UniProtKB/Swiss-Prot annotation:
The lineage of its organism: Bacteria, Bacillati, Mycoplasmatota, Mycoplasmoidales, Mycoplasmoidaceae. Signal peptide: none annotated. It comes from Mycoplasma genitalium (strain ATCC 33530 / DSM 19775 / NCTC 10195 / G37) (Mycoplasmoides genitalium). This is Uncharacterized protein MG208. GO terms for biological process: tRNA threonylcarbamoyladenosine modification. It comes from the Bacteria. Pfam families: TsaD.
Length: 196
């Protein structure tokens, strides 16, 4: 790899899996990717695998020009880690642009669908994405069933089950990520309220 090349970095820690993907800047070709289940030590593992992937591909941190991150809803720890790493990276490397997308939208591999992430206590985060609608709600399981029946033409995606490839998911959603001008304004969406 040439150290002058430019890259995109994707980090997702939202839901039971650590996902890191490096893309070539101009072509979006996948340079490297990692997807592993994580139960504990997410902070250490995220930093370790991120550093390992950069070293393995002989990339300097300054060669990352766009940082893509999912902001939840997701676990408290996962979302905090992802947003802190993304904010810190873009503050340390001001030429790196920050992009964010909620996990509900990210879970949908195509333009339209219903996305669900369970958060326990008979509650679900739900995203409805159609030609006319793009909304996120916290709803009961009963209301989720009603929503699916009322929109039965839309495919349903649940808890990141049956994901074939996170890099394909990233590439199909890359245009949905929103640019965050000020990294300090990046805020995660949690599955549950943090304990005070």
């Amino acid at each position: 790899m040439f150290f002058l090349s430019k890259y995109k970095l994707f980090l997702d820690c939202a839901y039971k899996t650590l996902n890191i993907i490096i893309l070539e800047m101009k072509t979006n070709a996948v340079v490297d990717e990692l997807s592993i289940g994580v139960e504990q030590n997410l902070t250490e593992l995220a930093v370790y695998y991120l550093e390992t992937m950069l070293t393995k591909n002989k990339l300097k941190k300054s060669s990352i020009k766009q940082f893509y991150v999912t902001i939840g809803p997701g676990s408290f720890t996962g979302q905090r880690i992802a947003t802190i790493i993304a904010k810190s990276w873009c503050l340390l490397y001001p030429s790196c642009e920050l992009y964010a997308l909620n996990s509900l939208r990210f879970q949908i591999p195509y333009e339209h669908g219903i996305s669900k992430i369970s958060c326990g206590n008979d509650q679900n985060y739900c995203g409805l994405y159609s030609q006319t609608t793009s909304e996120i709600k916290l709803i009961s399981k009963a209301d989720f069933v009603k929503l699916c029946k009322a929109n039965n033409e839309l495919p349903m995606y649940e808890n990141f089950e049956n994901i074939e490839s996170y890099s394909k998911l990233l590439l199909s959603n890359i245009d949905h990520f929103e640019r965050i001008e000020d990294p300090l304004t990046l805020q995660p969406i949690y599955l549950k309220d943090p304990v005070n």
